[in-house]
Every structure is written in C-alpha cells, then in structure tokens.
Amino acid sequence: SSSAPAVTYAASGDSEMGTAVADYALQFVGNPYVYGGSSLTNGTDCSGFVMSVYANFGVSLPHSSSADRSQGSAVDGLANAQAGDLVCYSGHVALYIGNGQIVHASTAKTGIIVSNADYKKVLAVRRIF
C-alpha cells in the first residue's frame, strides 16, 4: 500500500477493495431513503443501498437484508469487522466503514447516514472481499 497520506475511515488491515467500497458508499450520505428503492441518488432502502454500492464493484447481492446474512464469509463480530463488511441486524443491513461506524440507508426521516455500528444488536458481520 502507498505511504502517501489519505483521508479515509479505514484502519490498517482493511482490504483495499473493502476500503474502496466504504469510501464509495460514503459519498451518498445525505441522500434519501425510499422503501424498496435502490437508487443511490434518488432513494434507496437499506439492502438496496448495499446492493447498489457493491454493484459498482461488480458484485451482485440480493435486495434483501435477511438474504445478505448468508453472503460472503462470516466475520467473528464487530471487533473483527473491516471496512466494506456487511453488518446485519434484524430487518436491516449496513456497510462497515471502520472505527466502529457504519454507513446505511437508515429511515425515511434520516436518509443515508453514518451511525455507530452497535446502535442496535448485530446479528452477523459478513465479508464480501
């Protein structure tokens, strides 16, 4: 990896692709939440957000937060999460960006935001890259 300083959320040890996924996802913060949507600019729900972000990297994920829990490989909890990992909750899915934080299409009221990853009980962490 390059020694040039970079402004990023990712910590060392994160995969380059995972970091790229997190950085790409972060540019959509502030955009709207729309149930059933998958547009990163005009409105998406939680799984549509994850699906559309990963589609940019050539990865096809289901438009379903529960189905996302079986994608990729299992990660042993938030303590071992890396940038780009899927963080799965009951009825919800988010992207881990590092430093204990996630980016996600949260609610119609908030839209796409950054939150603490432990804001509710984590069911699974899944690594795609």
Explain the meaning of each model-derived region.
Residues 1-32, 121-129:
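Intrinsically disordered, low-complexity
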Residues 8, 19, 41-44, 73, ...:
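Residue-identity detector for threonine
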Residues 11, 24-83:
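Catalytic cysteine-centered active-site loop
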Residues 51, 59-118, 129:
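...with weaker cross-activation on analogous glycine-rich loops/strands in unrelated enzymes
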